[in-house]
């Protein structure tokens, strides 16, 4: 199969398991990506907990969602377990840290990469709690408004979108396809022809 050289830099878009992802950060041996669009609306936790690793959304992302990526052709061995800080937005550290293959951005991560994260016509969850259960706030989780500002919502709300984030091993880049949205018209035509040729070869 012909390899496609992908120019990877922050704000680039790649396709992984059929999911278009924005590259947020490039390190020596890994890249951080965020889903370009929401994968759908769902609760942070059906039981109304704002502690991310205990929630149904975290379990879905690291279970069924990974299976879906794999079914769509993703090399899921390239997913890197990542530890994120669950310090609440008011500074409480009750929830500690969690290590997951697929996660939501925290408020701090969102602020760090805000300039290259496009707004969506949707609200979407972050992993950070507004405060914690010990302070009387067991259910409020932070989220991003459609204009990019932040708000808080009860975790059982099913009306907010989900943008999965994850680290990939840099070595996988040779096998990834660039997102078609990244091409000029001329490049798009060449890429479509290339993919059609590859499809014909494998039939």
What are these regions (language model features)?
Residues 197-203:
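Short acidic DE-rich linear segments
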Residues 1-187, 193:
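Collagenous Gly-X-Y triple-helix signature in extracellular proteins
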């Amino acid at each position: 199969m012909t390899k496609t050289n992908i120019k990877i830099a922050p704000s680039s878009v790649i396709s992984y398991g059929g999911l278009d992802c924005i590259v947020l950060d490039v390190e020596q041996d890994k890249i951080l990506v965020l889903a370009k669009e929401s994968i759908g609306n769902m609760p942070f936790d059906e039981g109304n907990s704002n502690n991310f690793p205990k929630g149904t959304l975290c379990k879905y992302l690291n279970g069924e969602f990974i299976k879906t990526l794999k079914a769509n052709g993703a090399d899921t061995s390239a997913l890197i377990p990542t530890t994120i800080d669950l310090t609440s937005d008011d500074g409480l550290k009750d929830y500690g840290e969690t290590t997951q293959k697929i996660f939501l951005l925290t408020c701090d991560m969102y602020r760090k990469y805000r300039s290259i994260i496009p707004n969506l016509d949707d609200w979407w969850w972050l992993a950070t709690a507004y405060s914690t259960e010990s302070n009387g706030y067991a259910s409020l989780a932070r989220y991003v408004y459609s204009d990019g500002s932040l708000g808080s919502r009860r975790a059982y709300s099913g009306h907010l979108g989900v943008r999965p984030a994850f680290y990939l091993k840099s070595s996988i880049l040779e096998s990834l396809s660039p997102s078609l949205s990244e091409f000029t018209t001329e490049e798009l035509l060449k890429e479509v022809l290339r993919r059609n040729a590859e499809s014909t070869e494998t039939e």
